């Protein structure tokens, strides 16, 4: 009788329901050649490499680069992509390009900050998603200005489950190097997510592990000129990448 009952449970998906499979939804943006402001060298490669990494884990990846990364298209992509996520899923917005204190610069950014995309706008879209794990990675100058430049790995914030990992403190630039194919922050972010941050070798990358790896690597590589910051209300053990 017990054997029959167990068979029925498996048959109807009660023991291991398919609905509980975790998926990842990603929007990766990189802008090197801007319409109205100065150009950069590495952001589009940053975005392509982030997208390539996540494509090994999910089919739900949107990549926007150059002239395709307008303000309207970025915001619509975030809304459409993240609305598809379920509660057990994870959503990721990665941006590489120009930034200002409080936001990031789309392709059609002008000298007027109203043409930019504020972190408040981005977080508002993330908060509407059902996903419990929500991440923003931003490799952009002055990105830490959103929170006054704190370097804490777990700053109290009202947006539960939203993790922001930003490449620099307020007032700092995010460094590009001719010796590397990615910006300092994205280079260490990629290394960390690929396994470099897995200090306990359990094939799971947590928020605490990633912050320590990226922060220490970037500070050393930049000779103390750039300090990545992470904040939001989240558990230090929040899983950001699972290679099991």
Regions found by a protein language model. Give the residues of each.
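Repetitive helical segments and hydrophobic/amphipathic motifs
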Residues: 11-12
């Amino acid at each position: 009788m017990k054997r029959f009952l167990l068979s029925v449970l498996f048959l109807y998906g009660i023991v291991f329901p398919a609905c509980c499979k975790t998926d990842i939804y990603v929007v990766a943006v990189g802008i090197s050649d801007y319409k109205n402001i100065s150009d950069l060298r590495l952001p589009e490669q940053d975005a392509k490499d982030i997208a390539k990494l996540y494509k090994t884990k999910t089919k739900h990846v949107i990549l926007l680069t150059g002239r395709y990364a307008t303000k309207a298209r970025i915001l619509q992509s975030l809304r459409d992509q993240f609305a598809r996520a379920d509660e057990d899923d994870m959503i990721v917005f990665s941006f590489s390009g120009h930034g200002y204190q409080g936001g990031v610069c789309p392709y059609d950014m002008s000298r007027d900050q109203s043409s930019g995309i504020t972190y408040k706008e981005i977080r508002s879209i993330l908060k509407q998603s059902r996903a419990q794990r929500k991440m923003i990675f931003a490799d952009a100058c002055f990105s830490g200005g959103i929170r006054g430049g704190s370097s804490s790995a777990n700053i109290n914030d009202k947006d539960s489950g939203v993790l922001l990992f930003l490449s620099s403190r307020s007032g700092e630039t995010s460094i590009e190097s001719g010796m590397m194919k990615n910006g300092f922050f994205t280079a260490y972010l990629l290394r960390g997510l690929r396994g470099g941050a897995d200090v306990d070798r359990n094939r799971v990358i947590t928020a605490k592990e990633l912050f320590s790896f990226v922060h220490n690597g970037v500070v050393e590589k930049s000779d103390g000129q750039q300090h990545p910051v992470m904040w939001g209300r989240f558990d230090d053990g929040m899983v950001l990448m699972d290679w099991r």
